[in-house]
Each structure stands twice: as structure tokens, then as C-alpha cells.
Amino acid sequence: KSEFIKMAKKLYDADVLQSLCLSIQSRHETSLKLVKRATMDVSKDFKYYIDKCREMDLPYSTEMMLGNPGETVDTWKDGYLDVVRSGVSCDIYAVALLPGAELASAKSREENELEYELVQFPGVANPKYRPVREYMEQVVSTKWMNRDEMREMFAWTWCTRLGHEFNFTRELANYCETHDIIDLLGFYNKFHEYIANSDGVLNQYYKDHLLFRTDKYEYTLALKNIGFRDSLSLDDREGVKEDINVFASQFDIPADLVEFNDASMFRGDVRYPWRVKFDYDFVNDIDEEVEIEFTETAYGRATATRDNLIQGMSDVSDDYKYKKRMVCTRTAGKIVNS
């Protein structure tokens, strides 16, 4: 099972591959059986594969499909949290009824009560330069998840992905779960509610980069568009911290946890290794003053084709490439003084 991981590691070391994608579609067994993916090795042995990637120091990601038959609101939330809890970057796609696919058959449509909307096929061509557009039948409702629930799941996933997968609230959420303040599911249900109803920078990005697409059922595009992370992380970082401080005020947590949470995600305005003093030892979870040294890691990296193209441009500065490559990745902290 590890042979293709070893090959991927060679490609990564040669700077040909930025990360290995381990596609799983869903963590829900019933859903995988209904779409005939229950025998996929990666789905069954997901932990083995990610542990092997970590052992080889190989960045990795996965893919999931939202809208498969059998998937409910609860199973989707549990499955997605199971994936991101393990630190895996995850591309998410809406389910489409493609010509010739068994899922698109008349029998499947009737049995699974599939409803669809015609949506522009994502990634085929930029309509600005190619006037002929291609459309697909994108699933927007099933027997297990109605139209409103599915749209809500894409919004919930956008917020949860922002917080945990893109690391804006990962340490905050982990601390709350570890200390029995609130589990990850409850935390991100509240985070979604906060973003949707607040008036800060996170709500503005939510409206500009999610809602304007989900209102048109462009679910895949809504989650594939991750370019906003650059400005949110590098340019609007202080506004994000202010938002997170307001959100976190409802929890009984150490005063500087939000600062530690922020330092645990790559910053483009500091030089690493970077040292910060805290009143609490978050590394060892001990109530004592410490100084923590943060260094970069590649973990949590998520890239798009545009990002890969930038890495090969000769007229783009190395510093800019570096920041683009590391944006929203996790840092590693170690105690240097206590």
C-alpha cells in the first residue's frame, strides 16, 4: 500500500509535486456503498495513509463529495470533522450527474430522489475568454438531504474549513474540546452562526466569496475558490483577530489563547524562528509563563492551479512566492524559556 506514497515522496523531493491527494469521497459507510466506493483502500485505511505521509514528511490532502446519496447533515458534519481533525487539507466538490454515470441513470434519480440544477462546469474554461460555456447537472437535493439543508451544509463547511482546515481557529477549537468546554461540532456550529450573523471582516468575506455563489448553486466554485485566504491571512489579519476575539469571548479560556492561536498559523509579517511570551504554556497545557519559539511547517497547505503557476514565474519575487506557498499553514511551537 505504501509504494505509491514512496513514489509521491520522490516527486515531492524533486519539487514536481506539492502534496499527495488521497481521495475518499465520504467517511460515511452507507453513502460509500450507495455510490459503490466502499472498497476504496484509501477510505478504509485513511489513518494508515496519513500516518505514512507524516512518517515520510510528505504533505498530503484529500477530496470529499458533498451531496452523495445516503449522506445526511449529521453524517457529513461528523465525517468532515473526522478528516480535518487529523490535519488533512480537503478539496470538496458538489456531486454532479455526469452523462453515462450510474448515478445519473433514471433508476438512480428515482430511487435516491435526486434533484439538480444546471450549473456551469467548474474549471473547464474562463467564460471571459471562451464564450461557449459548459454546464452540468449538479445535485442540490437527495432523499437524505433537502435543498435548504444542502445549501446550509456548504455554508457550514466553508466556515468550518476556514476555522480548522485553514487554521484560523484550530488551536482555539482544540483547546475548547480538550478542556471539555465544547466539542468541535458544537464549536463550529457556533462559528458558522457567528460568521453568518456578525458584521466584521469574516462576514464580509462570507458574503463576497460564498453567498454570491451558493445563491446560484455554484457549490463547487464556492469551495474551490480559496484565493481569498491570501488577503484574509496576510492583509486583513488584525481584523480577523478582532473577529475571533469577539467570537471567543463566550468561552472560558486563557486570556492569551487567541494570541497563541494566531501565532500557530503562518504570518507573513515576521521572520522565523519567531519567539513570543505567553502567560500559559499551551504546548504542554500547563498554567505557567513561557516563551515559545515558532517555526514554519508545510502542514495544512492547500493549493490551486493558480498557486502552482505562480511558483514557476520568473518575474515574481521569491519572498512573494514563499508567502503564497506558506499562507494558512501551521507553525510548530517549542518552549525555549519558562
Please annotate each region the language model reported.
Residues F4-K9, R27, M40, N112, ...:
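Short, charged low-complexity intrinsically disordered segments located at boundaries
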Residues I24-Q25, E29-K36, L66-D74, S86-M150, ...:
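Flexible glycine/acidic-rich beta-alpha junction loops that bind and position SAM and/or redox cofactors
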